[in-house]
Amino acid sequence: MGFMAAVALVLGIGYVVVVFIVEPLRLRRRTGASGWVASLGATTAEKTASAMFLLGCGLELSNPALVLAGFALPRVDFPVAVAVAGAGLSVASVVLAAVSQHHMGQSWRTSIDPDNAAPLVTTGPFQVVRNPTYTSLLANSLAIGLLVPTPAALAAFLVCLWALQLQTRRVEEPHLRRVHGEDYQRYARQVGRFLPTIGRVSGFGR
């Protein structure tokens, strides 16, 4: 369990470094903007989603860290093959996030920027799901749980899922509808939110 916890912690930290540091720096070199946006005027929904997301990430990374520190957390004993699959899923999630951020270019931002409307991106991974970066976040959270299967891992995944659902449904999708109108609505009818075909919308406000 200690080895798997070490692998999980390295992969979890690696995901954060690649997605939130390396890729934004590469974006800054290409476009002059890193995508980091201060959400000073964030709504209550956005603030809540951000807080819950940070909580989920904290649970996700503290789970293997506590195991490495010697805490005897309740856990499920999965076959080694499940842990190997988790490691592979984590690596794949990093690749998906990096590819998604590359396709977004200047449209990738850490928060809604009401003063600078970004183009609607529907190419690459966005042809399959509307939020591939969020899909990668959830996949990485699931991967960490497969490597270190404890109640904390399940809680981390559920909190992250709740946070991303709130962020997309209450913050980002209404913004995209206001900015892109029928173009976004047509796109949302055809492409799923986090998984292919799942989360497609048939009308405004859903």
Pin down the residues of each PLM region.
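Membrane-anchoring alpha-helices and their flanking helix-loop junctions
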Residues: 1-115, 119-122, 140-206
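Membrane-interface loop-to-helix entry segments
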Residues: 122-138
